[in-house]
Amino acid sequence: AFICGVPGSGKTNTMLHLANSLWHHKKLIKDDTDNLSVTFKEESDPIPFLVLEPAKREYRELSRYDIPELIILSPSASTKFPMRLNPFEFPKGLTLSEHISKLCQVFEGAFPIAPPAPFILDKAIEGIYRAHGWNTNDINTGEKEYPTMSELYDRFQKELSQTTYDSEIQGNIQSVLEMRIGSLLRREMKAIFDVKHSTFSPEEWLKHPVIVELESLGEGPANFVTLLLCTLIRETLKA
């Protein structure tokens, strides 16, 4: 569904109602307590949802809708559920090769990265996984360690230093490293992205009612989070 309208037309209230209805969803099941007739009864069948809120904090209103299980993820470390996202953590049952391919697409979709930087990024991501004992055809069983964002920064630098590009191209790629990947390692961004484990495993995102507040992240990191979460959910459903 695509919901649009002028300011004040009720878009947010409609979405709040939909989210509340999903979590309080009920289904009819056959009641076997009466052998003389066929009857049905309602049974709670909550449907998890994920709200990515780019501006304001209007969806916190859902906490008044009798959803005690509601989880609000925010960049602020002082919240009950501070946002922690390791992009290199991926669903069990998926091959590493598949995740690397998708993760490169996330980086390129969130940040403008001109060739040949994507090639170096791909090599760097594969390299940090190999440093933790991974092979590209490995299927994730949850037993091996995941690399971190700071490891990617260092590996990207190493891969760049081993190239034979002229100084201008190397300078442009160095700018990509510092402005794109480096932006995910500064101040509060480091606490969000440079972690061993995410707040939730990829599989957990499909089990809870969750709001992710993106307003304070800035455009690039907010785009990165949005694309990453959508990718992890698709990967989980596929795995």
Language-model regions: role of each:
Residues 11:
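Conserved lysine of the Walker
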